[in-house]
């Protein structure tokens, strides 16, 4: 099995969202999620009438204590300026696999020496990731999805049991 190593800049287009504040969210309420640098609610800060992105993307939080948090997005959405966005351009790369691989690597590249932790685009695009063949990436992503779902269910059940005991 051949493993290929790519830097993000060699397989993705990197960008950021736009300036979206709470006033804009209030005045433009709709059905499309807006993602920010927050991590609660999967990074969703609200919903608006329009969208800027449509398809499979990987996003990351660029600032604050959760800088480097990685998310897989699939569908129509917008993003705030504190949300980095990767669009996979290489057909040999599964976006969901990329998201899982980046979750493992991104935190290593966060600048924690500044007053506000930050993960700049210039750092993200230099991150090297090892990729097995596409079929293997898809299998790994499916396995990790299943594990993530089971883990969330188990956590919810344990929380419910602990709450019931108290």
For each of these PLM feature ranges, what is it?
Residues 3-4, 125-166:
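Amphipathic alpha-helical segments
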């Amino acid at each position: 099995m051949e493993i290929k190593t790519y830097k993000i800049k060699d397989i993705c287009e990197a960008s950021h969202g736009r300036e979206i504040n709470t006033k804009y969210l209030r005045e433009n309420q709709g059905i499309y999620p807006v993602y920010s640098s927050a991590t609660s609610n999967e990074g969703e800060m609200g919903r608006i009438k329009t969208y800027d992105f449509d398809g499979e993307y990987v996003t990351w939080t660029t600032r604050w204590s959760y800088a480097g948090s990685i998310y897989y997005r699939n569908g129509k959405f917008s993003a705030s300026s504190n949300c980095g966005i990767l669009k996979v351009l290489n057909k040999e790369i599964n976006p969901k696999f990329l998201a899982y691989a980046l979750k493992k690597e991104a935190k290593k590249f966060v600048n924690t020496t500044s007053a506000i932790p930050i993960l700049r685009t210039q750092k993200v695009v230099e991150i090297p990731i090892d990729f097995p063949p596409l079929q293997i990436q898809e299998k790994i992503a499916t396995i990790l999805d299943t594990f993530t779902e089971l883990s969330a269910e188990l956590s919810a059940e344990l929380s419910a049991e602990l709450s019931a005991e108290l």
